[in-house]
Amino acid sequence: MFHLRTCAAKLRPLTASQTVKTFSQNRPAAARTFGQIRCYTAPVAAEPFLSGTSSNYVEEMYYAWLENPKSVHKSWDIFFRNTNAGAPPGTAYQSPLPLSPGSLSAVARAGPLVEAQPNVDKLVEDHLAVQSLIRAYQIRGHHVAQLDPLGILDADLDSSVPADIISSTDKLGFYGLDESDLDKVFHLPTTTFIGGQESALPLREIIRRLEMAYCQHIGVEFMFINDLEQCQWIRQKFETPGVMQFTNEEKRTLLARLVRSTRFEEFLQRKWSSEKRFGLEGCEVLIPALKTIIDKSSENGVDYVIMGMPHRGRLNVLANVIRKELEQIFCQFDSKLEAADEGSGDVKYHLGMYHRRINRVTDRNITLSLVANPSHLEAADPVVMGKTKAEQFYCGDTEGKKVMSILLHGDAAFAGQGIVYETFHLSDLPSYTTHGTVHVVVNNQIGFTTDPRMARSSPYPTDVARVVNAPIFHVNSDDPEAVMYVCKVAAEWRSTFHKDVVVDLVCYRRNGHNEMDEPMFTQPLMYKQIRKQKPVLQKYAELLVSQGVVNQPEYEEEISKYDKICEEAFARSKDEKILHIKHWLDSPWPGFFTLDGQPRSMTCPSTGLTEDILTHIGNVASSVPVEDFTIHGGLSRILKTRGELVKNRTVDWALAEYMAFGSLLKEGIHIRLSGQDVERGTFSHRHHVLHDQNVDKRTCIPMNHLWPNQAPYTVCNSSLSEYGVLGFELGFAMASPNALVLWEAQFGDFHNTAQCIIDQFICPGQAKWVRQNGIVLLLPHGMEGMGPEHSSARPERFLQMCNDDPDVLPDLKEANFDINQLYDCNWVVVNCSTPGNFFHVLRRQILLPFRKPLIIFTPKSLLRHPEARSNFDEMLPGTHFQRVIPEDGPAAQNPGNVKRLLFCTGKVYYDLTRERKARDMVEQVAITRIEQLSPFPFDLLLQEVQKYPSAELAWCQEEHKNQGYYDYVKPRLRTTISRAKPVWYAGRDPAAAPATGNKKTHLTELQRLLDTAFDLDAFKNFS
């Protein structure tokens, strides 16, 4: 904007009437400029006091003067008339160009006006100073807000008072003002709402109102937001006089909620004083805070709230926000109750919950879900986001108006855990946004025993939220009404702008980290003050009694009423005989299981398809279904090759995946594929999103053009995050069993940055929380000389975490043995060697009557390997996933002549067959591929061993001996054959790194393992 600098510029010859007419015609509604009135010719240096953001106020006055010179103070009238006449705005500024003789006479006639200029300059400078003062409070007022309920610490680590905040009258000198200016009246700029209906206020009142808005029990951080509308919205919410008013009914409701929150913790302390419960004492206001957010969101149309939180206060939230039956909570404290045979279970302050009820404030139905989580702080954040995104997707809530998420955090974890940053950066990505999350930080100003000054480098624990321009509302938790107002504004912000917002509840922790911990060892001064601190319930009750809102008997009756509720629930809890984890399910799947939670059958239909369907999908996969769409020439060749494969009734890896996905879409199964570069594929094999070479950002997804009324296909390149994105996809898969949700690592090696999600959620999730999940992990794996970080998906780690017993041979004659195995396992681990088998295992994942995580070690070089092809015949009706692919060559025709039976999995099979052919040993060595590693195919492998009675057994792998599959396979193979024979090893030696970075060394190691595999005398010295 040109701002008022142009006032001192040389003017076009306009009459006053022409000036007003031009202004009224051209003045924009929001952004204003003088460009349509003046020629901007004066250099900026000539009028520095009129430049920058300080010009806003002068600009307002100037527009008012143009419309009616009498509407402004006489001093402003003098200033603008002098400026328009060409007089210099001050002795410090350069004069404009000389005036024409006619204009000079006009200046002469206005002599008294020019003489008044020095006073005008002072007035303008004072007004600009006041505007700067207002802005200083808006930017830095939170630094001096009274946020710590203990009054001994600063909520931010920077304890210095900003120089531009008026903490004493001598600070007025910073702005060129003094005490004599305090009673002067100043016009208020449009960037503040402290005036309410008044457009001007005395300086004393301006400072008082700014202190009330920004320096009391609420500190607002928002001026880093680069959106004027959003900043103005926040200013209005916190600056408008009298905006934080509550009715007596609202105050009574707040008191009742505080009673429930406080008395619940006290009840648990009385009954189980020696039990860990991670109570909420010191931040009891959290419960009414959450209920306020939910109430306001429900009022704005939200009917489903998904929550995630750590252990602190979790039982209280379950009881008083989610409304879990109190007796079910109390049962968790009974050490005599036996657990149902449903899994290993989890501690009570990790459990989740799902509940649908009526919101009493809005009288609307609302569903509340608290996601179960491990002790790993903040790990559940992306899981909650993913589940929220899924629920929005399934109900068509494209703007987040029906489903929302609330995340609770601790101050130390919010600042310290990197997953918080990863999750924030998903918040505005098109395929990951949940259209705004309300974050509530329980800031008890300590992390276990660690002082905040040792726990973070930023002033506040919430500073990470600034990266996504989320407003941050700090509030003193001992002021319940301030907390309620902030939470109401947070809910309104989310409803209005659909962006993240943070509420920082600055509180304290009355006990130690848990109820058994002694905090005085490390925080003696803090806890001396805490011992003196009056509980917030008592403070607020005394306030309301003094205000006449309630009387003492009413308050005591509220306490007695809730105490009675707790006692009655405690009595009912004694009737419970067994603990059921299923009572704590956070993501039920209505209709998928029987009423008692069992699969509706224990069979799986054929995963094959008719040739017509295969051909149709293949034709779409090899074409562009949109007209006037120009694809890359190289991609044209790829599609042409696909078309030729389809004509030859053959599929490669990319086509097999396409056919599996396309057929499930036809059956109404939503498919979501996510990960880094998955749209094209890291190895440029997938190409599920086509890009027009002539039109920027124009894309086509052929998979969404397969069938009329098909389910939608979502394929989305993720941010460069594994931990956050895998957690997100896990949460997405929680919402419905009728979706195939896949996460692909760029290379399998990189999954370990998401190890927490794998170790704490995917592997033990069902055992801990009775929560099935069908997520699929695609992990590119293979030793191909690409170095230690592009070779191994660490299969040994996944296999180590499988829950089957290597020393126990199951009942192989059991009906539906393979399905029962799948039902009993904690996850399925496969390494397919053919595209056809890959096709089948993807389809089986949905056709099974239950859900298990599926870990697939996918190939890299096999994607284009000429032998890694499957015929349509392997994918027709009646076919299915092959857990084991037996030898089908000459060795199988004469099994008595076979000297060695090699077991392997994955890509190494093609190295072995090539070497066997080169050595002409096709009749002496049989090769059996184990495609499904877990659950282990005992039954099929026993048949293979019995087929070759004279053969010695060896396991061959390309991975190092202490890695890969050997330590998992060997004991199970030995159990299969009742330890009748040894199982030898042919592979690389043990190593610390997964692979060498030297190509020659890689090839040498490969040849050595092949030599061992086909040297029939290799193991004689070990017999």
Curated annotation (Swiss-Prot):
It is found in: Mitochondrion; Nucleus. Calcium ions and ADP stimulate, whereas ATP and NADH reduce catalytic activity. GO terms for molecular function: metal ion binding; oxoglutarate dehydrogenase (succinyl-transferring) activity; thiamine pyrophosphate binding. Thiamine diphosphate binds at residues 312, 411, 444, 446, 676. One of its GO terms (biological process) is tricarboxylic acid cycle. The modification N6-succinyllysine is found at residues 74, 564. Its cofactor is thiamine diphosphate; Mg(2+). It is an enzyme of class 1 (oxidoreductase). Ca(2+) binds at residues 143, 156, 158. Keywords: Acetylation, Calcium, Glycolysis, Isopeptide bond, Magnesium, Metal-binding, Mitochondrion, Nucleus, Oxidoreductase, Phosphoprotein, Thiamine pyrophosphate, Transit peptide, Ubl conjugation. 2-oxoglutarate dehydrogenase (E1o) component of the 2-oxoglutarate dehydrogenase complex (OGDHC). Participates in the first step, rate limiting for the overall conversion of 2-oxoglutarate to succinyl-CoA and CO(2) catalyzed by the whole OGDHC. Catalyzes the irreversible decarboxylation of 2-oxoglutarate (alpha-ketoglutarate) via the thiamine diphosphate (ThDP) cofactor and subsequent transfer of the decarboxylated acyl intermediate on an oxidized dihydrolipoyl group that is covalently amidated to the E2 enzyme (dihydrolipoyllysine-residue succinyltransferase or DLST). Belongs to the alpha-ketoglutarate dehydrogenase family. This is 2-oxoglutarate dehydrogenase complex component E1. It comes from Bos taurus.
